[in-house]
């Protein structure tokens, strides 16, 4: 039996599990039809070495995914094991995707499908938490759609009659823990009765104070080549460090887009961290990174809000990272409005009482106003705003404690103006060395904490755990909050 190949770096900085690739092919499959009224098509790359054996790229590939037939979103390689993309479309008919491998440079492969040949339900109802149900139909209706809801007592209610083009509807008048059935009636179609659905029970109790005090962002991967691979995490050491630093909570990433990161293999380690922190009175706020306003993406944030460890420990709130850019919400078809629409939809699904922290781009450091970023709308549906005030990353030259004080005061003040309301703010501070200016020294960590507290912030959460240096941990431990 041949030995298992070890991950190896190539001269082009590609990291393989196996030998370098010389060609690739595409595996494509229909993912079916969703509650947003879309057809979804998965296209996955498969790489092969010179001997024709399968090889796996672990990092640093560059793939272009192109189609004129819908919206294409690339997927983290961790979700499907290799570079992949999902096309969503409301087009009923032939679909084409061109995939070009830039790194490694292996040319372009084209793949085709036709939604008219797909099997599976084309009308879907899916629960979105305790307060919303999404109903989608494919293909798009052009004339009229009527949706009737039947509750657990058999009472019928016409929810909406949509005139003109339509493909989905969200019922935000449902109650927690209830059974519902829906009937969709469309022009020139027979009425379709959908399978019963049951809404979620109320989410765990939370409060705004859970997002106060000192905190740290913590994330991990399931890729064994990464330093933050979950198997490299030491739950006891993490808990001990959090206790020593006097942290009030940890923001732990659970989902990236529609990819749920707490895999069955990682769950025991992640649960041990959450349980260990809770034993010392330290909360864990779930952190998700939305990439689209789809039901599939929203359900990962909802899954986070309802997450419990094997011992039953709940999370203490939800923080959503609403950013522009291709790795975040920048590619969403709605453009910048997707940022606030996601927050609105999540609030509607969860209800008004669950702690929702919106991690937002810094208005002052990034020179943003309401015209470029929807601060006011995001604030309307959030309990806490958390600006990413990464003072060294955003500057051309290294800063001093005095400059940190000036920058954070300006950051706080501008966010209040852009939000156009008085509400809790937790500063997002910096411990990592991202950017040209290196790690903030301990004196700047202390200055940022002092300024955050002085201006009225409820706390400061630092990015990020893995990059935080011993002197920075000492500074955190030395400041009481």
Feature locations, PLM:
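Glycoside hydrolase catalytic-domain groove-lining segments
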Residues: 344, 352-356, 384-435
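Boundary/entry segment of secreted carbohydrate-active catalytic domains
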Residues: 203-242, 253-255, 290, 432
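Substrate-binding cleft of secreted/luminal carbohydrate-active enzymes
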Residues: 389-393, 424-481
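Pro/Thr/Ser/Gly-rich low-complexity, intrinsically disordered linker/stalk tracts
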Residues: 117-142, 176, 189-205
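Active-site groove signature of glycoside hydrolases
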Residues: 248-258, 304-336, 461
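Short S/T/G/P-enriched beta-strand
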Residues: 3-54, 102-120
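Aromatic-lined carbohydrate-recognition surfaces of secreted/lumenal glycan-active proteins
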Residues: 216-219, 283-294, 340-372, 421-434
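Aromatic- and acid-rich polysaccharide-binding/catalytic face
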Residues: 315-316, 322-326, 371-405, 463-468
